[in-house]
Design a protein with these regions (language model features):
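Class I S-adenosyl-L-methionine
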Residues: 16, 30-154, 162-181, 205, ...
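Short helix-terminating capping/connector loops at secondary-structure junctions
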Residues: 126-127, 152-158, 186-192, 216-219, ...
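S-adenosyl-L-methionine
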Residues: 178-210
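Signature of N6-adenine DNA methyltransferases within the class I
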Residues: 103-104, 108-117, 136-143, 158, ...
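Cysteine-centered motifs
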Residues: 12, 16-19
Length: 585
């Protein structure tokens, strides 16, 4: 067994008998013989990379490289050393970036374990491979991908890389990384060509696509690997003009990069990207989803369960996913979905889900259902049996009308004869709206007069749902029954951090409201919602997209749950029994 030390030397650290064991450490270039395994740790003590072709089962920050003869093993060791040096370089450069510029450009550089995981998704068929890396940073993704193609079981003979990086400081580091890759490719007998373009990717790519001759060196790529910038696009910007001219509708740079990159892939080409999950659902990304999936077919998804682990250095709390897609119209039977706590989780969970369960073929919005575990799969199966939309039930859902800072002159800390209840998220307790409920920073009532008439609704039976929750909360959907028998008043105001269900602006029949409240508080509904959305925000639009039990099923749920709308065991049993009974009739 050979160890690569911090000084780049190799030495046998066990009596394995499979490697040449000199009297002391030797340079990798001087070794002869055969080696079985090389173990590597980074010099600063941080977790090292894990090989994408031989995963380290212990997950202890050590690379395990299989024996393929000493020449291949030493070659792999050199790549490992380069990638670990590159990880240190990434941290140094990232720490020196100007925070203002970093925010403006949406820069979050890819950590080494994430890069290594992403490269493992590629399966190119040829040995002459062209790579596009847009927003390349210091080159972590491309370097890891080259190491995979050179050191993996299917060694490439020629690699061409096109890399875009607009930040001058990062571009300098990127040039250095590519020069290092070129040197190592030469020692491996692999022809390597690269081009670092210090220009705006979207503008340059749009220009390349309009060239009279197709098939230039800046189009028709075999592989695209992306950690695109994350920033909203100004409606009056040059970027917006470029995208419109290219036929791309995108509200964020990351979705714009994905849409443009898809156009640059050759048929059968592969794309792997790490992005926020937000594109998977919602009206803001509907046009993007239609555009992207008209060209690309999804076949792999990976979800990080923790918001903070993927980009720990940058304190990014966005929920991220990694996906692999192929430019083809042929849909696979299934999508492979996996999840892990973070990049260094040694035991990711993996399963296959029908493609039609991930992107429903008749869904005009092309929502991506991220079925993250077995519970998600079961919820998806049950949801397929739900028959009703809110419209079918004669119901609607709206966002609370009272924006408290705008209505401040009319708010009251203590209710009086001329005010009515103002309901906030903190008023939701054990399945019911509780009022009054003092709060140190919030009002409890709003003045009822002509100026506030449009902010209030009649005090009748409603279902109220929190719009915001922490990802780590037990339930994403938190619903409560507003019962006018418990809160005596002529009208009520719902604050803007709440959604409420109603029937054409008026209340619901009480039994129907109890059944629907219980359904929304069920584990089934919560898991179903998480399949649809990675947001901690529960928008009215999201609730409108859900499918619901029939009116008869909701009344069965109400009968079984009684008045207990918050006990999880009772609620889940009532929902399960009502849905099973209705299906058996």
């Amino acid at each position: 067994m050979l160890k690569v030390a911090a000084n780049g030397k190799l030495a046998c650290i066990s009596g394995c008998g499979n490697c040449y064991r000199p009297a002391g450490p030797m340079n990798a270039d001087k070794l002869t013989g055969r080696a079985s395994v090389v173990l590597v740790k980074t010099s600063d003590g941080s977790p090292g990379l894990r090989s994408s072709w031989l995963q380290n089962p212990k997950g202890n920050g050590v690379i395990a490289i299989g024996s393929r003869g000493l020449e291949d093993t030493i070659s792999s060791a050199r790549w490992v050393r380069l990638l670990n040096e590159l990880e240190s370089r990434r941290r140094q450069v990232s720490g020196r970036l100007d925070p203002v510029s970093k925010a403006e450009l949406g820069q979050f550089l890819t950590p080494a374990p994430v890069a290594q995981f992403m490269t493992g998704m590629f399966a190119p068929q040829g040995r002459d491979i062209s790579i596009l890396d847009a927003g390349a940073g210091v080159g972590s993704l491309t370097a890891a991908l080259i190491a995979r193609f050179v050191g993996g079981p299917r060694t490439a003979t020629r690699i061409r890389a096109t890399l875009y990086e607009i930040d001058s400081a990062l571009a300098q580091a990127l040039e250095r990384t590519m020069a290092d890759c070129a040197e190592l490719c030469a020692t491996c007998g692999v022809m390597f060509e690269y081009e670092v373009l210090r220009e705006d990717f979207l503008g340059a790519a749009a220009a390349a696509l309009t060239l009279p001759l197709a098939g230039t060196s800046r189009t028709d790529f075999d592989c695209v690997i992306l950690n695109p910038p994350y920033r909203k696009i100004n409606g009056e910007s040059e970027t917006r003009r470029i995208l419109t001219a290219a036929g791309i509708e995108a509200n964020n740079l990351y979705s714009a990069f994905l849409a443009m990159a898809a156009r640059l892939l050759k048929q059968g080409g592969e794309l792997v990207a790490i992005t926020p999950r937000s594109f998977c659902n919602g009206p803001y990304f509907k046009a993007f989803r239609r555009d992207f999936f008209s060209r690309m077919t999804l076949d792999r998804l990976h979800v990080y369960e923790s918001r903070s682990h993927a980009f720990r250095d940058d304190e990014v709390l966005q929920e991220n996913l990694i996906f692999h897609a192929v430019r083809t119209q042929k849909r696979p039977d299934a999508v492979v979905i996996s999840s892990s706590l973070g990049p260094l989780d040694p035991s990711p969970r993996m399963w296959r889900v029908s493609y039609a369960d991930v992107i429903h073929p008749r869904d005009p919005e092309m929502v991506v259902h991220v079925i993250a575990d077995e519970a998600g799969r079961k919820a998806a199966d049950v949801a397929d049996q739900l028959s009703c939309s809110l419209h079918d039930l004669g119901l609607s859902v709206s966002t609370g009308r009272v924006v408290d800072f705008r209505a401040r002159p009319y708010l009251r800390v203590n209710p009086d004869a001329r005010s009515v209840p103002l309901i906030y998220p903190f008023n939701l307790e054990n399945g019911y709206v509780v009022w009054p409920k003092p709060h140190p920073k919030k009002s409890t009532a709003i003045k009822s007069e002509s100026a506030t008439a449009d902010l209030l609704i009649p005090s009748e039976v409603y279902i109220v749902v929190k719009r915001f929750s922490a990802k780590e909360e037990r339930r994403r959907i938190v619903a409560a029954l507003y019962d006018p028998d418990l809160i005596r008043c002529p009208a009520v105001g719902f604050e803007n951090h709440l959604n409420y269900y109603h029937a054409e602006g008026r209340g619901l029949p009480r039994p129907l409201a109890r059944g629907l409240t219980a359904f929304l508080n069920s584990t089934l509904a919560d898991t179903y919602f998480r399949n649809l959305s990675g947001h901690t925000q529960v928008n009215a639009q999201d609730l409108r997209r859900l499918k619901y039990p029939s009116r008869e099923q909701l009344l069965l749920i109400a009968d079984r749950v009684g008045d207990d709308l918050a006990d999880q065991i009772i609620v889940d049993r009532a929902v399960e029994e009502a849905l099973e009974l209705a299906c058996s009739i």
